[in-house]
């Protein structure tokens, strides 16, 4: 399928994401290096495993919010809106910021053929870097 013929919504839809899984971190590492490794120096909690990742992320998010920390969270999949996947201090990224960052990453790094999930992670890390968060909660895309 040619990406040029897809709408923005189709590019980020769950069906498109499921059908375009490419395992490995090499593409993502290269893109993040070219972006100056956003968030590289920010401590992160990575949540992995088969079940309960979303629940653990929600618990941690509530604890950090009550502690008045400045933090970023990525989760997947979203329930209603793609912007749910990227949050700072319990607030979703707004659609304008998300689309601007997503389209920029898609155009600038088209040759890497990033998956939609990888593009969203790049968006999140760039957004968190811009917001100068002090801690990250990152839910793994696959167990």
Model feature map: region roles:
Residues 25, 29-40, 65-143:
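ATP-dependent carboxylate-amine ligase catalytic core
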Residues 1-49, 56, 62-69, 74:
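Short functional linear segments
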Residues 15-16, 59, 80, 112:
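Sequence-level detector for tyrosine residue identity
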Residues 51-53, 78-79:
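Short active-site-proximal "capping" loops at secondary-structure junctions
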Residues 49-52, 139-141:
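Conserved phosphate-binding and hydrolysis motifs of nucleotide-dependent enzymes
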């Amino acid at each position: 399928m040619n990406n040029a013929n897809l709408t923005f919504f189709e590019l980020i839809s769950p069906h498109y994401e499921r059908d375009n899984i490419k395992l490995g971190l090499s593409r993502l590492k290269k893109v993040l290096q070219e972006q100056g490794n956003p968030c590289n120096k920010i401590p992160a909690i990575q949540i992995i495993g088969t079940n309960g990742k979303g629940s653990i992320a929600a618990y941690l998010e509530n604890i950090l919010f009550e502690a008045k920390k400045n933090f970023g969270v990525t989760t997947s999949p979203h329930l209603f809106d793609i912007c749910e996947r990227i949050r700072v201090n319990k607030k979703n990224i707004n659609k304008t910021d998300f689309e601007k960052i997503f389209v920029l990453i898609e155009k600038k790094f088209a040759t890497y053929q990033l998956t939609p999930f990888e593009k969203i992670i790049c968006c999140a890390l760039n957004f968190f870097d811009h917001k100068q968060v002090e801690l990250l909660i990152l839910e793994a895309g696959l167990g």
